[in-house]
């Protein structure tokens, strides 16, 4: 019956095919979701409980592809999160949170300004504190009363310039963080192209250096830099910066130009 039909992305969540609508949309975009044997191309397609919905792609390790970003940081920066108290800034579906837990974190504060996005799998996990509808820029010890060992930041529509000063007081001395540098939210409107994509490597270099400067001003040392293994939703190349909260703040002079060049070469080869 027509009144029982729902958007297929919402139906995928209620039927357990996907952990969240955001993830369902990713799965549909991959071309691996089938409705009654036919490929689904739009998340807004209507379907009912009686329809056969299948996902034929590879099973993923995390609730969202965000986990792959932190996974690379764990591997490249040689992070050990065993027994750590962590903060996931911009948690969304919880890919970073999931990766933290799978790498031994004992507790994760999942912070996001939105609501209803965190995967049900993570919401029901006793190790996860869901801080939805929380603007991290104005967060206090009331929301996070204990100092963290590690934090990650994957935020949109705001510069890390405003996130890092709020993060520093919440980390233990000697604590560390991995932040995703998104050129489209750091470069300024004049440097952002169509569909919000920043392609110019020179702008990427400038953006990364600016973020490193923000980090030092907020009480961090810049330890390492690499590029994210997956692009942003509109195709932006993004970068992973590894920070440490030290008594002496410094930039260990990561090869910014080299990392940017390697990132562009990697994604160009994959096109």
PLM features per residue range, with description:
Residues 1-51, 85-86:
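A basic, amphipathic helix-loop patch mediating RNA/tRNA/ribosome contacts
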Residues 33, 106-111:
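Short beta-strand element of Class I
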Residues 82-92:
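Conserved class I S-adenosyl-L-methionine
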Residues 93-104:
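Conserved SAM-binding loop of SAM-dependent methyltransferases across substrates and taxa
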Residues 109-162:
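S-adenosyl-L-methionine
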Residues 161-178:
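A short glycine-rich, Lys/Arg-flanked "PGG" loop and its adjoining helix->strand segment in the class I
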Residues 183-200:
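Short, glycine-/aromatic-enriched active-site segment of Class I SAM-dependent methyltransferases
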Residues 237-271:
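Flexible, glycine-/basic-rich loop-and-beta segments that form/coincide
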């Amino acid at each position: 019956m027509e009144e029982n039909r729902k958007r297929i992305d919402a139906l995928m969540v209620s039927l357990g095919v996907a952990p969240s609508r955001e993830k369902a949309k990713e799965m549909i975009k991959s071309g691996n979701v089938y409705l009654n044997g036919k490929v689904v191309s739009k998340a807004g397609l209507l379907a009912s409980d009686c329809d056969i919905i299948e996902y034929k792609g590879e099973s993923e390790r995390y609730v969202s592809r965000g986990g792959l970003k932190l996974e690379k940081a764990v591997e490249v920066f040689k992070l050990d999160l065993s027994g750590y108290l962590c903060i996931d800034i911009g948690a969304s579906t919880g890919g970073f949170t999931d990766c933290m837990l799978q790498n031994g974190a004992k507790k994760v504060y999942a912070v996001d300004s939105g609501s209803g996005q965190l995967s049900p799998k993570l919401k029901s996990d006793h190790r996860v504190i869901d801080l939805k509808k929380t603007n991290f820029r104005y967060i206090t010890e009331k929301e996070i009363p204990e100092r963290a060992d590690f934090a990650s930041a994957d935020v949109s529509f705001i510069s890390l310039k405003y996130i890092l000063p709020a993060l520093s007081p919440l980390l233990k001395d000697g604590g560390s963080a991995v932040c995703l540098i998104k050129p489209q939210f750091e470069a300024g409107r004049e440097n952002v192209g169509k569909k919000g994509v920043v392609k110019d490597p020179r702008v990427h270099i400038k953006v990364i250096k600016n973020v490193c400067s923000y980090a030092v001003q907020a009480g961090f040392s810049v330890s390492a830099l690499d590029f994210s293994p997956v692009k942003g939703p509109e195709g932006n190349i993004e970068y992973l910066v590894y920070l440490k909260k030290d008594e002496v703040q410094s930039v260990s002079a990561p090869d910014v130009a080299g990392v940017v060049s390697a990132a562009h070469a990697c994604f160009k080869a994959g096109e």
